[in-house]
Amino acid sequence: MEEEIRKDFLELMRLMDEGKIQEFKQKANETPPVDIAEGLEEVEDSGRVLKLFRMLPKDISSDVFAYMTSDQQQLIAESATNAELTALVDDMFLDDTVDFLEEMPANVVKKVLQNADENTRKLINQFLNYPENSAGSLMTIEYVDLHDYFTVRKAMDYIRRTGIDKETVYTCYVIDEQRRLVGHVSLRKLIVAPESTYIRDIMDTNTVSATTTDDQEVVAEDFRHYDLTSIAVTDKENRLVGIITIDDIVDVITEENTEDIKKMAAIIPSDEEYMDAGVMHLVAHRLPWLMIMMISATLSSTIITSFESVLAGAVVLTAFIPMLTGSAGNSGSQTSVTIIRNMALGEVELGDWLRVLWKEARVGVVCGAALAAVNFLRMMIFSGTTVVISLIVSVTLMLAIVMASSVGCLLPMGAKRLGLDPAVMASPMITTIVDAASLLLYFMIASVMLGL
């Protein structure tokens, strides 16, 4: 926790402990809800967590609750009275309530639903039925919708009356009499337009939207591609049912990037926070791929064993194996990360595989030649090896870099073609293939050049 945030939170705790209620509420109103929630994460005493939360002003307690960890949310939900729980759910945005309930055990979900009003309960159940990680599970129904026959005056009056309870008023979505999405209009355009103008005359009909079943990664890509702050969500009949705002998509992007990074490092993704995870939990998510890579490394051992005669004739070759496999592995990893990232951004398509291969092969040739030249001079000057040995190692290094660059681009694209996650191929598969291929190249070149 940053020093300034920690200082503000400690001040809140001091005011709470000293019973200075008015000063506490004033300080709480001046502190961002997310900072209060972050401070509560470090409080181990559940009694103090409950006490501080109950002292918060009612107009910010729901915002703080939305940012709290699922464990602390469960603590508060189980400890709250029916009246407190009803007030909390009523004050929260619906999408935040659904996010909270998705992490809760059945007894907490039941308690929350029992204390929600009938309409809210119906909406929550509807949201919980949407597929996980879909646009429907992310959206909120707290948005401003305007009929196309509204005048600007009527639209502004409507926004003033209802806008306080909406997640955003900066983009208003326009619907027809059947609630079908027909366009959108910005608050800026409403402010500058004459009051007698009809919404249909100033709205933008080129509206980007998602359906309730769209995957959250697709929605996130739309936000990035079109520079959106919100997106409309429609059903199969193009009727407006909700919107997704940028704050929820930022969370999605963070989750997806974290998941991809873990996969690329051969770690099974987990939703649990690192500091909250137990040792055996971390072991369970790392050990499977470590086992797979250890067993697959047998291929490299087999290759070395097969060329024992070459090594016996030139033992010095053994010293350069780590450098060759390490350099090739690094090159393959650089290429795979670049390709995976560009595929995720939509800048590289499967149909581009030949162009990508040609480009990466040329990059590999240039990088490999540069490394080989430097390595040859290094070996001649500092290692004291013969010209032949220096050439064997340097030529192998260049070819291994070219090979690794090619494998690094083809494996992720091949994985995507087969419907697999390209990130899974980044570290474990590339390491195994590149190591084995580099050793094979090394010993074959050595056999030819040494006549063994």
Predicted regions and their residues:
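Hydrophobic packing positions in regular secondary-structure scaffolds
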Residues: M1-I268
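Non-transmembrane, extramembrane segments of multi-pass ion/lipid transporters
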Residues: D248-L282, S333-V356, M413-G419
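Soluble-to-membrane junctions at the N-terminal ends of transmembrane alpha-helices
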Residues: M275-M291, L350-A369, V393-S394
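Alpha-helical transmembrane segments in multi-pass membrane proteins
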Residues: W289-A297, F320, L324, A328, ...
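Juxtamembrane "helix exit" motif at the C-terminal ends of alpha-helical transmembrane segments
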Residues: M294-L311, A372-T385
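Membrane-water interface of transmembrane alpha-helices in multipass transporters/channels
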Residues: S306-I321, S383-V395
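Membrane-helix cytosolic exit motif
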Residues: S336, L411, K416, S438-L450
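Interfacial loop-to-transmembrane junctions
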Residues: G414-V434
